[in-house]
């Protein structure tokens, strides 16, 4: 692996040592990256510290058309790059060949100047691609960092032009591109995998960033339907499979709901949350389309969902000040959405999260959070539904393979072995399992991933202007 120093950045993005627990999440050299992409990460000057990557350029070099999909924040204050990328996708009908990302400045709540700057980034990156006779613009843009400040756009545009000299497809290029996503992250989040569909081998790789201001609630482009509101989460997933634009968007929407929309660090939704997917067909396999080959599409959707889940979990593991990685599973709900809403509420409860930091198996806080979420009306009768407390069970499940610890069974509290409870709570990874006992339907189950609230989280966010 190439030599690199990974830091936790403050409000001025000065270097600080990373925690030792993050070392085993740092990406290792891999040859399983998708074909037909060239990328780089460079220092353009957005961040004050010299040499720290803050600009990433990703190009599809495939001779085949490249489909693109996106899920964006539902925050009312959508940043300029979100609005611009949404417009590019809408005009192109789901085709794009490049992504440009800057870190250190979010270009959010920046008015007309912010929109002009985002479009300037698109046009500068378009210039690195062969001209398209069909599309005016071929680039999607992402930004992350401080809200309410204008981009140093001249530095960024110079960086985009200069990036042409360092574009590559080797591991170092992927690694540098992932580093350029980082703000308060302590390590670059980069993963890749190989998968097969109908005998054809494909590759998928992706990078994301996020450690604070994490509670995404993203939806597909141009179809925002706000639900409850949830530093920014950005992600880009690339594959050399050929996937139709509609199928790529449908698969990404499904995957994001069960991965990035199922994580929380602090319960705050960003203005910039964005996940992009590109499929360039460079592996020369048949087109994956849900209308013509449902089976192949379902395999691809599962691969994408599993991969997105891996990336999303890295964000929680790198949560600002986090000492715990906790899976919250809710089962036996009337619907997936009910289970998801309850798991979300548990995962964002400040009382639950502080108990996790204090290594206190305080299941009363878990129940209180669960019971505060109204269930959706019955899908068959439309009648309101309520949780039956006499059917609810809560169990703590350790990650080390030892015995689970039930603390509530069918509404009746167990005599809890406090020593055993403490053993589980001191683990870095464990699971909170809540069974509502209202349904046996597997669709009534959802998972969420969260972390604890520590003193360090308060210190970081007292120092960092988001």
From Swiss-Prot:
Modified how: The alpha and beta chains are autoproteolytically processed from a single precursor protein within the mitochondrion.
A cellular component term, taken from the record's GO annotations: mitochondrial matrix
Site (Involved in the stabilization of negative charge on the oxyanion by the formation of the oxyanion hole): residue numbering on this chain: 144-145
Site (Cleavage): 231-232
EC number: 2.3.1.35, 2.3.1.1
Pathway per the UniProt entry: Amino-acid biosynthesis; L-arginine biosynthesis; L-ornithine and N-acetyl-L-glutamate from L-glutamate and N(2)-acetyl-L-ornithine (cyclic): step 1/1; Amino-acid biosynthesis; L-arginine biosynthesis; N(2)-acetyl-L-ornithine from L-glutamate: step 1/4
Binding site for substrate: 183, 209, 232, 320, 461, 466
Entry keyword set: Acyltransferase, Amino-acid biosynthesis, Arginine biosynthesis, Autocatalytic cleavage, Mitochondrion, Multifunctional enzyme, Transferase, Transit peptide
Catalytic activity: N(2)-acetyl-L-ornithine + L-glutamate = N-acetyl-L-glutamate + L-ornithine; L-glutamate + acetyl-CoA = N-acetyl-L-glutamate + CoA + H(+)
Gene3D superfamilies for this protein: arginine biosynthesis bifunctional protein suprefamily, ArgJ beta chain, C-terminal domain, L-amino peptidase D-ALA esterase/amidase
Pfam family, any one: ArgJ
Entry annotation: catalytic residues: 232
Transit peptide as recorded in UniProt: 1-9
Keyword RNA-binding: no
Any single GO BP term: L-arginine biosynthetic process
Entry's localization field: Mitochondrion matrix
Chief place where the protein resides: mitochondrion
Alphabetized NCBIfam families for the sequence: ArgJ, PRK05388.1
Main function: Catalyzes two activities which are involved in the cyclic version of arginine biosynthesis: the synthesis of acetylglutamate from glutamate and acetyl-CoA, and of ornithine by transacetylation between acetylornithine and glutamate.
Quaternary context: Heterodimer of an alpha and a beta chain.
PANTHER family: ARGININE BIOSYNTHESIS BIFUNCTIONAL PROTEIN ARGJ (PTHR23100), ARGININE BIOSYNTHESIS BIFUNCTIONAL PROTEIN ARGJ, MITOCHONDRIAL (PTHR23100:SF0)
Protein family: Belongs to the ArgJ family.
Protein name, UniProt field: Arginine biosynthesis bifunctional protein ArgJ, mitochondrial
Native species: Laccaria bicolor (strain S238N-H82 / ATCC MYA-4686)
High-level lineage: Eukaryota, Fungi, Dikarya, Basidiomycota, Agaricomycotina
């Amino acid at each position: 692996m190439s030599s690199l120093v990974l830091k936790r950045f403050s409000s001025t993005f000065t270097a600080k040592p990373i925690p030792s627990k993050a070392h085993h999440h740092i990406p290792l050299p891999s040859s399983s990256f998708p074909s037909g992409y060239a990328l780089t990460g460079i220092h353009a000057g957005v961040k004050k510290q010299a040499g720290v990557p803050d600009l990433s350029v990703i190009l599809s070099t495939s001779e085949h058309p490249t489909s693109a999909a996106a899920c964006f924040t539902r925050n009312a204050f959508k940043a300029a790059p979100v609005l611009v990328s949404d417009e590019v996708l809408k005009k192109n009908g789901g085709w794009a060949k490049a992504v440009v990302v800057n870190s250190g400045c979010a270009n959010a709540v920046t008015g007309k100047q912010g929109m002009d700057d985002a479009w300037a980034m698109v046009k500068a990156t378009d210039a690195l691609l062969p001209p398209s006779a069909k599309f005016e613009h071929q680039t999607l843009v992402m930004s992350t960092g401080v809200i309410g400040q204008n981009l140093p756009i001249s530095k960024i545009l110079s960086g985009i032009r200069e990036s042409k000299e360092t574009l590559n497809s080797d591991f170092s290029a992927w690694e540098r591109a992932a580093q350029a996503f980082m703000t308060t992250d302590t390590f670059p989040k980069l993963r890749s995998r190989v998968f097969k569909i109908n005998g054809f081998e494909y590759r998928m790789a992706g990078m994301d960033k996020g450690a604070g201001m994490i509670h995404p609630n993203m939806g597909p482009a141009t179809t925002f339907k706000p639900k409850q509101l949830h530093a920014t989460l950005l992600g880009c997933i690339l594959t050399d499979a050929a996937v139709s634009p509609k199928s790529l968007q449908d698969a990404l929407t499904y995957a994001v709901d069960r991965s990035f929309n199922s994580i929380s660090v602090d319960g705050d939704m960003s203005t910039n949350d964005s996940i992009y997917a590109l499929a360039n067909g460079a592996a020369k396999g048949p087109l994956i389309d849900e209308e013509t080959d449902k089976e192949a599409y379902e395999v691809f959707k599962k691969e994408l969902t599993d991969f997105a889940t891996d990336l999303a979990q890295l964000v929680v593991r790198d949560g600002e000040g986090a000492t715990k990685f906790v899976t919250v599973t809710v089962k036996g709900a009337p619907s997936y959405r009910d289970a998801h809403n309850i798991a979300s509420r548990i995962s964002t409860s400040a009382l639950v999260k502080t108990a996790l930091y204090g290594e206190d198996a305080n299941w009363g806080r878990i129940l209180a959070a669960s019971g505060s979420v109204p269930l959706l009306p019955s899908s068959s009768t439309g009648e309101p539904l309520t949780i039956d407390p006499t059917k609810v069970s809560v169990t703590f499940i350790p990650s080390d393979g030892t015995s689970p610890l039930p603390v509530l069974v069918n509404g009746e509290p167990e005599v809890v072995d406090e020593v055993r409870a403490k053993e589980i709570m001191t683990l870095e990874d464990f699971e909170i399992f809540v069974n509502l006992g209202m349904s046996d339907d597997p669709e009534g189950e959802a998972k969420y991933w969260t972390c604890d609230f520590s003193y360090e989280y308060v210190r970081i966010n007292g120092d960092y202007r988001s």
